[in-house]
Amino acid sequence: MMKIREFKNSIEFKNDGQLSLFFLGTGGAFSKKYFQNNALIIKGNSHILIDCGTLCPLAFSFFNSDITQVRNFLLTHNHADHIGGMEEIALVNMYGTKQVPNILITDEFKKILWNESLKGGLKIKGENSAKPTMSFDDYFHQIKPKKIKKSPRPFYEAKIGDINLKIFRTKHIFTDKNNWKNSYYSIGVLIDNKIIYTGDSQADKELIEWLTSEFNIECIFHDCQFGHNAVHTDYEELLKILTPDLRKKTYLCHYSDNADQQKDRVMQDGFAGCVTRGVYYDCE
């Protein structure tokens, strides 16, 4: 079960050892009310930020904290609401903290992230330098996850301090509905073998059934849109793929600005609720 704990003063990057999630934002790409769906995982002395969108540095400031405190990142895909803050992360660390942040990332996505998103703003250092042309490795330290064999989809594992993370491919944007292999690169995260964080995903019964059959899942944070959406999980579809028992464990996130109008229905339909930004979700 998840216990909700209030935010006080500034974001905590350490705790007494329980697994906690703090959502900087809970909104979709175009939300003007909820910031973007980016979440900090904390456990003991360890932390990692899942996604860092264009508004993420501002969100940290909103919660009286500095994003340069984040030393570990995991990015689910290269849409701006998930990676748009990473150019700032690269530059404020290079010229400010003089530290190199860690990114948990596969070789496949490392190439996509650099060549298709970050390279345009970071390739040229812009000063007299013995190395005027920069690369991903000049700004970030790659933590490469280990591939897990015998899984129905690419499945990787790594540890960030005390936090165990497994990443899996999701169906977000694709050209063939029946084949995730043709889909745009996007991942979800299994945290400490008990929390599913879907990232951006369409309704994916096969994925949920696989994870819940293999692991003792205590909580699911699921992408959800209220109204038809071609690249996210529609609420009506989610009702169809989640059993009543799973709904009790599921919090909805990455929603649009009309979510307030749906919260009563969400509870009536048996979900744990809509995620609230700015509180701690502690795994008991």
Label every model-predicted segment:
Residues 1-196, 261-284:
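Binuclear metal-dependent hydrolase catalytic cores
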Residues 201-284:
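Cap/insert and terminal regions of metallo-dependent hydrolase folds
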